[in-house]
Amino acid sequence: GVIPCGESCVFIPCISAAIGCSCKNKVCYRN
């Protein structure tokens, strides 16, 4: 929840979800 994954999720889900990232405020975060 605090580490930006360098990916946005405005139109598509987080591809980085594969490594534990999740969508928050239109940006993908980890932890």
UniProtKB/Swiss-Prot annotation:
Keyword Disulfide bond: yes
Superkingdom: Eukaryota
Keyword Cell membrane on entry: no
GO annotation (BP), single: regulation of defense response to virus
Post-translation changes: This is a cyclic peptide.
Cyclopeptide (Gly-Asn) crosslink residues: G1-N31
S-S bonds: C5-C21, C9-C23, C14-C28
UniProt keyword annotations, A-Z: Antiviral protein, Disulfide bond, Knottin, Plant defense
Function of the molecule: Probably participates in a plant defense mechanism. Has anti-HIV activity.
Domain comment as written in the entry: The presence of a 'disulfide through disulfide knot' structurally defines this protein as a knottin.
Protein family according to the UniProt entry: Belongs to the cyclotide family. Bracelet subfamily.
Name recorded for this polypeptide: Cycloviolin-A
Taxonomic path: Eukaryota, Viridiplantae, Streptophyta, Embryophyta, Tracheophyta
